[in-house]
């Protein structure tokens, strides 16, 4: 049997494209000759300007409904072929927000609502408003970026002696994202595939004490990298996974097996 070629959607929208994972994904998609629409709350991701070949940049705060409406209009005007969406935008544990981290009495309802708006509601509303486009274009696919904390409780011993935290709204939003994945997979079938990736901890300059404790719990002996997650997203976007939908691909080096 010869080597099979695989295809990606013609255009892929990446939210949260300014972060470490989002920017790495944009780079990988461009390398595969995919037209990328990148969006984030900041102007561009470092070190590349918005004019980078293969990437059309839209600055948008997905917490704001009017920004999501504008984003959808831009996607409609540019997506002439099959469409992929990677919902990656999210508040993360290191986000510097008042009422975000710390003990539960320090976590505000306002910030809880903001986190769910960006991580979950924005993913729902953007997909809803592009459903007609997705359904008419064979090869369209959606990938949600979830987390192992959608289904695992945090091990607080990992965080001792550090400024790192694991806010309640983060995991709750990601759990919602995974159920949205399953709901959309059955609702948009057979024309659109919908899957998710659930990364474990990615090594991003955390304190060495945290890294050592975390890696001691990982059967593969290390924290993840952006490349580990990007490769999984590429698989789920492409025709390599043509018979896969409604699934959550856990990319954690076996952390969740412990």
Residue ranges and their predicted role:
Residues 2-37, 184:
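Canonical Rossmann dinucleotide-binding motif of NAD(H)/NADP(H)-dependent dehydrogenases/reductases
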Residues 88-101, 253-254:
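Conserved NAD(P)H cofactor-binding loop of Rossmann-fold oxidoreductase domains
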Residues 139, 189-193, 244-246:
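Short, small/polar-rich loop/turn modules that mediate ligand/substrate recognition or access, typified
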Residues 218-229, 240:
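A conserved structural motif in NAD(P)-dependent oxidoreductases
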